[in-house]
Regions:
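C-terminal terminal-subdomain/extension
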Residues: 1-51, 65-74, 107-197
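Compact nucleic-acid interaction/catalytic patches
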Residues: 72-120
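Short acidic, S/G/P-rich loop/turn micro-motifs used as interaction or catalytic elements
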Residues: 63-67, 86-89
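Pocket-edge structural micro-motifs
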Residues: 62, 98, 141
C-alpha cells in the first residue's frame, strides 16, 4: 500500500465511522484530508514541539501487565502519550499506551497482522510503513504514570522522546481514539439503558 492508497483508505475510514454526520460535512472533511501532501506524507513531525505532547513516542516505559491468574509482570516497551497536551501541563499524571511488537509473535496469524498494519482494529493503532511499523499501540492497556517522574527521566536522558506526531498522524490518532472510546453501543444495549432511565 502506498501513501496515496493509505490516505484514501483513511478518508473512507473516517467517513464510515461518523455516518451520522451530514453528507456535505463529510465531503468537506474528505476535501480537507486531501489537502495533505501525499508526497510528503509522514507520521512524524520534523519540528520540536517543545515538551511532551499528545501522540509523542517515548522509547522505554516500564508497563505492568496482569495475567488471568492475577500475576503481574513488567513489560518495558515504547509508549505513546495519550493525555491531551493541555492536560499534560495541568495534571499530576500522564496517560501512556504501550507499543506492542507484533511481527515476531504467534499472537496473530498473517491475516491479523495485515489487518493490524491496515488499522482495521478499533482498539489498536499501527503507524504503518514507519520506523515503528512493527509495533501497534494498544488502547486497551493504557496506564497512568506520574508526570513529573516521566519529565525528569526525559530531562536526565534516561527516557528518550523519540518522535512527535505530524498533523496527519495526530488527526489519525484522534480518529482512532474517537472510534475506540466514543463509538455508539449496539442498539439492543442502548435500548436497555433507556429502559432503566
Amino acid at each position: 500500500m502506498n501513501n496515496k492508497t493509505f490516505l484514501e483508505e483513511f478518508i473512507n475510514y473516517s467517513n464510515q465511522i461518523f455516518p451520522a454526520i451530514d453528507s456535505s460535512v463529510r465531503n468537506s472533511i474528505k476535501e480537507a484530508l486531501r489537502q495533505f501532501d501525499i508526497n510528503k506524507f509522514s507520521w512524524f513531525s520534523t519540528v520540536d514541539l517543545g515538551g511532551v505532547c499528545q501522540g509523542d513516542i517515548l522509547n522505554k516505559i516500564p508497563f505492568t501487565f496482569q495475567e488471568e491468574d492475577g500475576k503481574s509482570y513488567a513489560f518495558p516497551t515504547k509508549a505513546m502519550v495519550i493525555s491531551n497536551s493541555c492536560d499534560i501541563e495541568n495534571d499530576k499524571y500522564i496517560l501512556l499506551a504501550p507499543l506492542i511488537p507484533y511481527l515476531d509473535t504467534d499472537e496473530f496469524d498473517e491475516n491479523q497482522k495485515r489487518d493490524l498494519l491496515n488499522n482495521k482494529y478499533n482498539g489498536k493503532m499501527c503507524l504503518s510503513y514507519s520506523s515503528v511499523g512493527n509495533y501497534y499501540i494498544d488502547f486497551s492497556r493504557i496506564q497512568s504514570f506520574n508526570k513529573n517522574l516521566i519529565v525528569n527521566l526525559i530531562n536526565s536522558n534516561k527516557i528518550k522522546l523519540e518522535y512527535s506526531l505530524s498533523q496527519f498522524g495526530w488527526y489519525f490518532l484522534l480518529t482512532k481514539m474517537t472510534i475506540h472510546f466514543m463509538r455508539v453501543e449496539d442498539h439492543k444495549l442502548f435500548s436497555t439503558r433507556l429502559k432503566g432511565a
